[in-house]
Each structure stands twice: as structure tokens, then as C-alpha cells.
Design a protein with these regions (language model features):
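Helix-breaking motifs and short loop linkers at transmembrane-helix boundaries and internal kinks
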Residues: 63, 84-89, 278, 299-301
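Cytoplasmic helix-loop-helix junction between adjacent transmembrane helices
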Residues: 96-134, 327
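Helix-loop boundary and gating motifs at the non-cytosolic
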Residues: 1-45, 218-219, 223, 227-245
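Helix-to-loop junctions at the C-terminal end of transmembrane segments
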Residues: 51-63, 267-278, 363
């Protein structure tokens, strides 16, 4: 539960940007092209994706707690860069730093919970972890929308992020304990789920297995990437779309908060559900639901339709997000599970960068609804690929 609280603070640190930065790009820095405005998500996604990989490797080598504390230390300058940044380049640089911090902190809370709970409740643990993180994102997105409407886009919203970082660092240093030895205990009784997933693999072999060779691991990796591709679109272009339709900052803040709120709260149910019915059905259904929600955003034109769409998008993402992480934990051997999680998160958070670039280019050329429609089609295709390629019974029955 301490790690759940820490990850809520990790999510809050990210949530300080969700409502504000898309508006900051246009209203303060006068960025007209969507591709230019989305550079901060591209920078965040590349930095976080790369750091996820190293977080897994460093956690295996040095332990989980040192990586977690380092992530909080890296985050310290972010709110001040966002508050005082005189140019858009400062905002992009702040998101590089934030991406590094998020890669270290969020990845480590995932690994530590996997270490602690064992295989039978892995979905429940991932649901708790991701629910805490995205409820933190949602609550902060909503709070910063109201703060900005009263006090302006800077500095008020980012002072909340500074407080989260201070508390998260204090908790991680003073109260969090190392969990790596639990993975060693689990490894002694581990029964491989698939052939080729034995203990003695090099980092290169783990990368190729997770990314390409294993049908289940690679299916999960591509689905994670597409999921965050559409989240990058939602983060960067939804507030711009809503503002262009005449919605107030308060209403934009509500829509920006409802999506991760449903996503976060829903994972309290879907994570545990995947322990019972398996990972594959929830992943496939979740990707299809997301695609339908994105299609609603593309054709919608008012607050009511968009509210229904973001609720549906949050529900679909809740079905997928903890389930994908649990599926990685099911297949990966405890000796290299942290590395496999890091590689999955490399692909998944690389989706932020791909989504920002792809949706920005399409939006510049054809408008935001066209960009949303293309991403909806990609999301549906990803779900179909999981249905065809992923093995069916990937929840652990053998300890």
C-alpha cells in the first residue's frame, strides 16, 4: 500500500501537464502547427521509453529502491523549468527530464509490486499500481484546470507538482524497502510458462524474446505501444480540439480528468478480473473499445458526446493497461522479469513519441478529426493482431 501511495504521487507529477501544456503551447508560446506543439510529448515519450529499458537493467543490478530514489531526484527541477521557462525549448527540455524520472519511478513501482505479490495475484497488484498512478494523473489534471482558470497557466498549476515530488522523494527515501530478494525466492519455485523462457538469458536474448520472438510477449509489446500512441494523441490534441469548439478551460479540465479517472478506477476491477479469466480476452476487448471511443471523438462536436467518448476510452484502457503488465510477468522468468518489463515499457512508452509525431503530421495536413480517425483504425488493428497471435492461457496456473 505504501508503493500504491508512491505511485499515486508519480502519476500526479505527470498529471500537472495534462490540461496545461497544450494550452500553454498556443496561448503563451503561440505555436500554431500541431506538430510543433506536440514536440513535448515526443521528447517525453523518447526519454521515458529509453529510461524504462535501463530501469529494468539497473533494478536487476543495483536493486529497486536506489532506482526509485534516483527517479525522484531527477524530477526535482521539472516544475521550475515549466514555471520559469522563457521559450518552448525549455518546456521540451523539462519533458525530457520528466520522461527520465517517470521511466525510473513508475517502472520501479511495477517491478516492486511484482516482486511482492507472486504470480496468483499479479493482475490485482498491477491494477492497484496503475489505478493509483492514473487516478493521480486524473486528480491533478482536474485540479490544475481549476487552478489555471483562477490564477493563470503559470505558476500555480506546477506548484502542485513540486509538492508531489517533495513528498514522493521523502517517502521513497525514508519508508520504502528493497524488494529484489523476493524475486529470487519466487525464482526458486518458478515453472516456465513457455519453452525458451528459462532463467539463463542474456539481455540481448531477453530483448529479442520480448520484442519479436515470443508470440505472447511480442503481442503485448505492440499492443502497449499502440495504447500509448492513442494516449499521446489524447494528451496533445484533445484539449486543442475541445478549445477550438469553444469549451472553457474548466470543461477541458473535466474532460482531461475523466479519461484517466475512469482508466485509473477501472483497473481496480480489471486487474483482478484478468487473474480469473485470463489476459487475452481483456486485451482484445479493451483495444476494440478504445477504437470505438476514438471514433466518437472524431465525429463528436459537443461536450456531451466527448464526455461519453472519454469515459469509454478510459474503460477500454483500464481493460488493457494492468493486463498487459501482468501478461509480461506471467511469461517472463523472475530472474529477467525486470528487464522484460523494462523492454515492454520501452515499446509501450515509445508509443507517446510515435503518437505525437503521427497525429501531429496528420492533424497539420487534414485536421484533428482525421488524426483521431487514423489512430482509431490502428487501435482496432492492434486488438485484432492480439486476437490472432497471442497465446490464450497466459495467466499463471503453475507457481
Amino acid at each position: 500500500m505504501l508503493l500504491v501511495a508512491v505511485n499515486a504521487l508519480v502519476g500526479g507529477t505527470l498529471g500537472q501537464e495534462r490540461t496545461i501544456l497544450p494550452l500553454l503551447a498556443g496561448q503563451v508560446f503561440q505555436l500554431d502547427l500541431y506538430t510543433s506543439a506536440l514536440t513535448y510529448i515526443l521528447a517525453f515519450g523518447v526519454a521515458k521509453a529509453a529510461t524504462n529499458y535501463f530501469a529494468g537493467t539497473f533494478s536487476d543490478r543495483y536493486g529497486r529502491k536506489p532506482v526509485l530514489v534516483t527517479g525522484w531526484l531527477v524530477a526535482l527541477p521539472v516544475p521550475f523549468m515549466l514555471i520559469f521557462g522563457p521559450s518552448w525549448g525549455w518546456i521540451v527540455a523539462a519533458n525530457v527530464v520528466l520522461g527520465i524520472s517517470q521511466g525510473l519511478t513508475w517502472s520501479t513501482t511495477v517491478m516492486m509490486k511484482m516482486d511482492l505479490v507472486g504470480p496468483e495475484r499479479r493482475g490485482l497488484a498491477m491494477g492497484l499500481n496503475e489505478a493509483a498512478g492514473y487516478l493521480g494523473v486524473a486528480g491533478t489534471a482536474l485540479a490544475t484546470g481549476y487552478i489555471a482558470s483562477t490564477y493563470g497557466l503559470r505558476p500555480g498549476p506546477f506548484l502542485l507538482g513540486a509538492a508531489f515530488i517533495a513528498v514522493g522523494l521523502g517517502l521513497s527515501v525514508l519508508t520504502v524497502r528493497e524488494t529484489r530478494h523476493h524475486a529470487g525466492t519466487e525464482a526458486a519455485a518458478h515453472v516456465p510458462v513457455h519453452s525458451g523462457t528459462h532463467a539463463g538469458l542474456s539481455s540481448r536474448e531477453v530483448f529479442t524474446l520480448t520484442s519479436f520472438r515470443d508470440r505472447s510477449l511480442s503481442s503485448v509489446s505492440q499492443a502497449g505501444m499502440v495504447n500509448n500512441l492513442n494516449d499521446g494523441l489524447a494528451w496533445g490534441l484533445f484539449p486543442v480540439l475541445f478549445a477550438a469548439a469553444g469549451l472553457s478551460i474548466e470543461r477541458i479540465g473535466v474532460l482531461a480528468a475523466v479519461y484517466p479517472a475512469v482508466w485509473g478506477a477501472g483497473q481496480l476491477i480489471t486487474g483482478a478480473l484478468s487473474d480469473r479469466i485470463g489476459r487475452k480476452p481483456l486485451i482484445v476487448a479493451g483495444m476494440i473499445v478504445q477504437a470505438a471511443a476514438l471514433a466518437m471523438v472524431a465525429v463528436g462536436a459537443d461536450f456531451g458526446i466527448w464526455l461519453a467518448a472519454v469515459i469509454l476510452l478510459g474503460a477500454g484502457t483500464a481493460m488493457v493497461y494492468p493486463t498487459l503488465l501482468a501478461a509480461i510477468g506471467d511469461v517472463a522468468h523472475p530472474h529477467w522479469r525486470a528487464r522484460s518489463v523494462g523492454i515492454y515499457r520501452l515499446w509501450r512508452d515509445g508509443g507517446f513519441a510515435v503518437g505525437a509525431l503521427l497525429s501531429g503530421v496528420i492533424a497539420d495536413a487534414y485536421g484533428i478529426p482525421a488524426a483521431v480517425g487514423v489512430v482509431a483504425a490502428l487501435t482496432a488493428a492492434s486488438g485484432i493482431l492480439v486476437a490472432v497471435r497471442m497465446r490464450r492461457a497466459d495467466h499463471i496456473s503453475a507457481g
